């Protein structure tokens, strides 16, 4: 992924202090603890005035859901910030979390992406697996503003000349 981003001219900076999102498992046991963990990562990015780019659909979903919860509830954001202040952090809510697929479609564009291909993949069939976190809940993922996100992997596959094969597990957890 880093090579793809570099080829597309996108500079990346690793957030050394970022932790794993908890993959939704932590949130099932203790949602506030999971949200503190994820908003902490967003606060690090916010301090650097950077968005979060992820290739993991679970990370995308978990961070986006945590961000959505604090942005729609200022009192909850204050609770989270009271925990973050112990580390000298505060989250104001300006960090955008974007999956690499969304960057390819929304920021680069499929036409520009196609210009970077060395070979077309005609004759190949791929069965895309999104998982559940990158497609649900849609209100936390910006689908109303960007409806193409629901089909982003299909769109990237088709742009290579390959064909998409649907299967029932495409968006299952």
Name each model feature, range by range.
Residues 1-173:
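Iron-sulfur cluster-binding electron-transfer modules in prokaryotic oxidoreductases
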């Amino acid at each position: 992924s880093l090579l793809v981003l570099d080829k597309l001219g996108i500079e990346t900076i690793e957030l050394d202090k970022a932790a794993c999102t908890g993959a939704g498992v932590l949130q099932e046991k203790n949602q506030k603890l999971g949200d503190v963990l994820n908003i902490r990562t967003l606060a690090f990015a916010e301090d650097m005035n950077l968005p979060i780019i992820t290739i993991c659909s679970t990370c995308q979903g978990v961070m986006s859901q945590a961000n959505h919860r604090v942005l729609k509830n200022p009192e909850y954001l204050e609770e989270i910030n009271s925990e973050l202040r112990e580390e000298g952090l505060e989250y104001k809510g300006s960090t955008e979390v974007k999956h690499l697929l969304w960057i390819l479609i929304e920021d680069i564009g499929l036409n520009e992406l196609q210009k970077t291909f060395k070979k077309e993949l005609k004759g190949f069939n791929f069965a895309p697996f999104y998982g559940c976190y990158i497609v649900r809940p849609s209100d936390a993922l910006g689908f109303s503003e960007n409806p193409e996100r629901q089909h982003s992997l299909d769109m990237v596959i088709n742009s290579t000349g390959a064909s998409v094969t649907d299967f029932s597990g495409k968006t299952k957890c």
